Amino acid sequence: MSEPLAPVRGIQIEIPGSTNLALTDLLIDFTGTLSLDGLLLPGVPEALIHLASTLRITVATADTFRRASEALQGLPLEVRLVDCGEQKARIVDELGAEHVVAVGNGRNDVAMFEAAALGIAVLGPEGAAGVLLQVADVVVPDVYVALELLLHPRRLKATLRA
């Protein structure tokens, strides 16, 4: 299924004029965020492996194409199957909402974004739900930029400062 999760360093982000962030967990959607038509986007596994030394990674997915578990097998993350957006929000709460960064693109990610300390909406090849953009803290063109922001968190300072 998935590899054992190792201890993480976390990400500290000092945001001038706003609340500082102390992130330990990434909760990320699969369909349309990490994948296209149920297949992982090129380069995503390597980025997730790199990021796993900094954040614990949980993939929460309705698994529209029924390929998530197979596609993510062997990566240092946990896969959680969900039926609705409220279940994603409950996972945020389980992880400790004040320490969670959420990444997604769909309508069923809205509650997850509202519960998380930081929400990054991904436009990507499948687009993004308009309602999600209204609750996102940051909007990026694709998952690669989202993961790069977490690998280089100082880049978030300018976007999030008050």
Report residues per predicted region:
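C-terminal cap/substrate-recognition subdomain and adjoining C-terminal extension
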Residues: 56, 63-162
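Weak global preference for isoleucine
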Residues: 11-15, 28, 49, 57, ...
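Short, acidic loop-to-helix structural element flanking the phosphoryl-transfer center
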Residues: 14-15, 20, 37-55
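Non-catalytic pre-domain segments flanking phosphatase-related domains
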Residues: 1-28, 162
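Asp-based phosphoryl-transfer active-site loop
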Residues: 19-38, 113
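Short amphipathic alpha-helical segments, especially helix-boundary/capping motifs
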Residues: 6-8, 21-25, 42-46, 65-68, ...
